[in-house]
Amino acid sequence: MSSTGKIKIGINGFGRIGRLVARVALLRDDIELVAVNDPFISTDYMTYMFKYDSVHGQWKKHEVKVKDSNTLLFGEKAVTVFGCRNPEEIPWGETGVEYVVESTGVFTDKEKAAAHIKGGAKKVVITAPSKDAPMFVVGVNEHEYKPDLAIVSNASCTTNCLAPLAKVINDRFGIVEGLMTTVHSITATQKTVDGPSNKDWRGGRGAGFNIIPSSTGAAKAVGKVLPALNGKLTGMAFRVPTPDVSVVDLTVRLEKPASYDEIKAAIKEESEGKLKGILGYTEDDVVSTDFIGDNRSSIFDAKAGIALSDNFVKLVSWYDNEWGYSSRVIDLIVHMASTV
């Protein structure tokens, strides 16, 4: 921690999530952004990309400007900029970075992410699912974090939406089995027009004018953060031509019979209690753009869901897959720091 008591963070990869994690960090008084690494963007271009955002609007908290080729100024706050391609070359230690947000989408396993430790960082939070780093979803299993874990994953935006909802339903009524569909906004890996995508042919089709079926590991990943649900959930995705905000459709068979009103009441109670700020609840006639900038992980839409019987129900929950997720990255870091 810095002399001000703030947690010092660095960001590797200044893409969608990297820039929004920076915004979230700069809006908080318990976090200090001290360094950013991106080999593909100059400092003046970083300033422009940070300041102007087609989805979340212009940054208005303070002026952002270039001090020199290695320093950005956010108001009076200087942030060091590196341009290293290899994580082990980034001198995080020189700037006092304790926690690195690994948001390139490239270094998602423990071995690759560990390179940041060589550069002087103490901990790494991967902003994507990881095949071998332990995954944490704030509000669900972050209490299982142990201080000796140096590299962790914040899971995916969809897992962060699904897991709190699934936890409430499983705790209260028990889930026998379930299927999830996420209707998901476009992301950076998609194509503006039809183009090559060898591993996912459908994913190479134009994002702006297609509904594209896709795979997602989000439902299975819930089994990693909630072992009681391991093997009970799976799912798929539809990529749709919206710039941000996605929605989870969770259809489950319940162990304990419950009316839809009882399910709504349970979710509402949790949203105002232990999961306040993580799980939301609304009975308004909302649509996707109403959730742009919502920092909660999952907002249950009481009017959109429907029950077939007391044991079989469809539940609908919204999430800003960019802003909500980026908010949880910072929350996870704050929780990790509190255990030291």
Swiss-Prot record:
Top-level taxon of the source organism = Eukaryota
User: Kind of enzyme, top EC level?
Assistant: oxidoreductase
A single GO molecular function term of this UniProt record: NAD binding
The cellular location(s) given in this protein's UniProt record come to: Cytoplasm
Pathway per its UniProt entry is:
Carbohydrate degradation; glycolysis; pyruvate from D-glyceraldehyde 3-phosphate: step 1/5
User: Which residues act catalytically here?
Assistant: C157 (nucleophile)
Q: Which GO terms describe its cellular component?
A: cytosol
Q: How does it assemble?
A: Homotetramer.
Other known facts: Plants contain two types of GAPDH: cytosolic forms which participate in glycolysis and chloroplast forms which participate in photosynthesis. All the forms are encoded by distinct genes.
This protein's name: Glyceraldehyde-3-phosphate dehydrogenase, cytosolic
